[in-house]
Amino acid sequence: LIYYPDMGNQQREHVSYGLPWNPDQAERIAQMVEGLELVLKLWDASEPVTFAGRYYQASEAVCRPLTVQRPHPPIWFGEAHPDTLAACARYGQGWHSTPVSLPVLAQRLGALQQACRAVGRSAGDIQKAMATQILVAEDRETVRRRYQQIYGLAETEDIPDSLNPAWLIGTPDEVEGKIRAYVEAGIGHFLLWFIDAPREEGLRLFADEVAPRFR
């Protein structure tokens, strides 16, 4: 189990759950961090917890059963807001990025390193992950054809140059090369969205031809 606190970026998500929407991002992060502090106290407590915060209050609260993972499940944070990185440096065991180019990733990892340094912690203690989209096929022509089918392109259209550079689009060798570049930059885990799902050819090809190269 991984615990992933989040500030919530979508107003519609708050509304759908009957929660008030606060457009102030910094305040949403502060609320997230305070909620995490309360959760950690409850997970660690042998006695009832009383908590008086700005956003949350609890009186003689008890959380049972306690977590199986001790002292608690690993805590992961996402995105690159300075306040979120500060919280990750203080509480996190992992940090997760959206799909970004290598230069942008370097900036984000540098900011995380600075946040860790500010609290006397090594950024090497924090695992790093990135989510990205993937389309892998045996040859470049098949990659192009499947991309056209997925996004409704004409047969004469090619994969656009403006494609997100973090997307893993290509043959097994090309996808391996892109993954290695991000691994060398510091990413240790990948959350992969196979854009040709529910077809299984790409998933199976990745499992058979690409994943074993990283074992």
Predicted region positions:
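Active-site-adjacent structural elements that line small-molecule/cofactor binding pockets in enzymes
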Residues: L1-R215
